[in-house]
UniProtKB/Swiss-Prot annotation:
The keyword Oxidoreductase applies. It comes from Staphylococcus aureus (strain MRSA252). GO terms for cellular component: cytosol; glycine cleavage complex. The modification N6-(pyridoxal phosphate)lysine is found at K273. InterPro entries: Aminotrans_V_dom (IPR000192), GcvPB (IPR023012), GDC-P_C (IPR049316), GDC_P (IPR020581), PyrdxlP-dep_Trfase (IPR015424), PyrdxlP-dep_Trfase_major (IPR015421), PyrdxlP-dep_Trfase_small (IPR015422). This is Probable glycine dehydrogenase (decarboxylating) subunit 2. The keyword Oxidoreductase applies.
């Protein structure tokens, strides 16, 4: 591995350099020792980097220029919906009345903010077909866990606390079984059939008196619509279980079909994906949860309600599982999502899904002669191809993903779902042009040709990135996670 990386900010540090200039204080101060118990006081000086303001600005500007995001390149990361985030969202989120408000202000002083929360709840109820919505959860997995805790409370309140199993398809997101475990449930896997859909016979086998719920994404992670969803609903409901909708793939079906109409009892949405909150850098996200009326009394509190002409917090929720996020969640993402929904309207959201599905099927059709496509039917917003043909020449999907970096394209999701060998999951979203799609397709085809005729060229990629081929085995076995460890290595 060679590196053209920048020095760490700690390596730029020089004792005595400061990025600030403050006058000497004329206010009497007390010593730390007089204010805090000794157990709370550091014994050694904190090792903060000492750099001048110019060095600080240059350092982070240099790093920002090495970043990759949807604003500077194609980002077909499957199941992540890396669509363009309209800049009007940012303008609205920066309106001082919103950006300078505080969650501890009196309700009378933040009526505009509360109205946004209430209005977004109403919009999401309409989009999902749910009866009530909470915006509190901070991200998708947090929304999953919140919904499962609601299910748990519901079953316990009905004298069925023994229901401790959650059914998860073998193509599911990894967060599904993780959320189930975190909520105190056992995960039970249901197999996919030859079409990539839930195997109905296997579902009948695993459903029993201990079934609390099934977690489904529809379309599923293979990009395939579960056409037997109504039969799945009947099987699970007849067994006393509930249906949970993972909203990761809602971008494919807006204004086409709603989770509530498919029989789901709860749903989470990813505002940072479907509704254009910027994501990919670790947050903030937002994972609202919607439920049918039978579960509404279990939602986290407080809720925001409309009382006459005013908006207020409602803490009088009979069976509430309690608060799941400080204050009321990530408000800045609500502003961006609400702006997007109001800008697009119902017709616009429908066109979003139609374009997302069209783009995915266009790429799939053009690549089908060059890669193995395990599921031949039309896909929705994403699809999974397999690199097994290229593997015959010693080139794996991982190698092709690294080669894509040399062409200014972020690699798709690879080796997921787990039930496709050498899988590559591609989600172009609706915001990309045909020219961009063609560039990506032609690039992948050229890489497939390289794999056949010059495999070493692919195996040694990437060539143009700051860090080239990583020694991933050593990185996994001997991770260097802090500056102190780096100094020891050097």
């Amino acid at each position: 591995m060679t590196s053209k990386s920048s020095p760490l900010i700690f390596e730029r540090s020089r004792e005595g350099r400061y990025a600030y200039s403050l006058p000497i204080s004329d206010i009497k101060t007390n010593s730390v020792e007089s204010l805090l118990d000794d157990k709370f006081i550091r014994k050694n000086k904190a090792e903060f980097p000492e750099v001048a303001e110019l060095d600080l600005v240059r350092h982070y500007t240099e790093l920002s220029n090495k970043n990759f995001g949807v604003d500077n390149g194609f980002y077909p990361l499957g199941s992540c919906t890396m669509k363009y985030n309209p800049k009007i969202n940012e303008k609205v989120a920066r309106i001082p009345g919103f950006s300078e408000s505080h969650p501890l202000q009196d309700e009378d002083q933040v009526q505009g903010s509360l109205e946004i929360i209430y209005s977004l709840q109403e919009e999401l109820k309409e989009i999902t077909g749910m009866d009530e919505v909470t915006l509190q959860p901070a991200a998708g997995a947090h929304g999953e866990w919140t919904a499962l805790m609601i299910f748990k409370a519901y079953h316990e309140n009905n004298g069925e606390g023994h229901r401790d199993e959650v059914i998860v398809p073998d193509s599911a997101h990894g967060t599904n079984p993780a959320s189930a475990s975190f909520a105190g449930f056992k995960s039970v896997t249901v197999k996919s059939n030859e079409r990539g859909e839930v195997d109905i016979d296997d579902l009948k086998r695993v459903v029993n008196e201990n079934t609390a719920a099934i977690m489904l994404t529809n379309p599923n992670t293979l990009g395939i619509f579960e056409k037997n969803i109504m039969e799945i609903r009947e099987i699970v409901h007849n067994a006393g279980g509930l249906l949970y909708y993972d909203g990761a793939n809602l971008n494919a079906i807006m204004d086409k079909v709603r989770p509530g109409d498919m029989g789901f009892d709860a749903v989470h949405l990813n505002l940072h994906k479907t509704f254009t909150g910027p994501h990919g850098g670790g947050g903030p996200g937002s994972g609202p949860v919607g439920v049918v009326k039978e579960l509404a009394s279990y939602l986290p509190k407080p809720m925001v309600i409309k009382d006459g002409d005013k908006f207020k917090y409602d803490n009088d929720i009979k069976n509430s599982i309690g608060r799941v996020k400080p204050f009321y969640g990530n408000f800045g993402i609500y502003l961006r999502a609400y702006t997007y929904i109001r800008t697009m309207g119902a017709t616009g959201l429908k066109e979003v899904s139609e374009a997302a599905v069209l783009n995915a099927n266009y790429i799939k059709a053009r690549l089908s002669e060059h890669f193995e496509i395990p599921y031949k039917q039309y896909c929705k917003h994403e699809f999974v191809l397999s690199g097994v043909r290229q593997k015959e020449f010693g080139v794996r999907t991982l190698d092709m993903a690294k080669r894509l970096l040399d062409f200014g394209v972020h690699p798709p999701t690879i080796y997921f779902p787990l039930n496709v060998e050498e899988g590559m999951m591609i989600e172009p979203t609706e915001t990309e042009s045909k020219e961009t799609l063609d560039y990506f397709i032609d690039t992948l085809i050229s890489i497939a040709e390289e794999a056949k005729n010059d495999p070493d060229k692919v195996l040694e990629a990437p060539y143009t990135t700051v860090i080239d081929r990583l020694d991933e085995a050593t990185a996994a076995r001997k991770p260097i996670l802090k500056f102190e460890n780096l100094k020891q290595e050097k």
